[in-house]
């Protein structure tokens, strides 16, 4: 099995566009999806990303920039760290995420490079 990082990208205001009922349903669907990944033994970690308080460290001098980091409305909303047989299996796991039913979303699928001892 190989490890993959699934990076979830949305537009910044999409969560506030959902009604309380829609948000509740989204959370239930997301919980079921995560539960399935855990049951299948493929989930290594997952978290949403806070929209505020981010910093960008750049260049060798360590200069800082407060969020947002670019002019795009697209933001990194969270990630999943999974294991899968190959990139195609990882893509299928990403495609099964119920977030696509609720809000405009993109999920990047990145193979992770193993390092010492992994």
Q: Which positions does each model-derived feature cover?
A:
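Conserved, structured core segments of small domains
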Residues: 1-118
């Amino acid at each position: 099995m190989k490890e993959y990082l699934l990076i979830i990208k949305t537009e910044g205001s999409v969560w506030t566009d959902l009604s309380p009922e829609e948000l509740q349903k989204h959370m239930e669907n997301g919980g079921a999806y995560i539960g399935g990944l855990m049951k299948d033994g493929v989930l290594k970690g997952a978290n949403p990303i806070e929209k505020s308080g981010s910093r960008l460290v750049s260049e060798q001098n360590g200069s800082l920039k407060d969020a947002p980091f670019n002019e795009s409305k697209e933001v990194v909303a969270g990630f999943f760290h999974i294991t899968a047989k190959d990139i195609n299996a990882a893509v299928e796991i990403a495609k099964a995420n119920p977030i696509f039913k609720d809000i405009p979303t993109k999920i990047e699928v990145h193979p992770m490079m193993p390092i010492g001892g992994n």
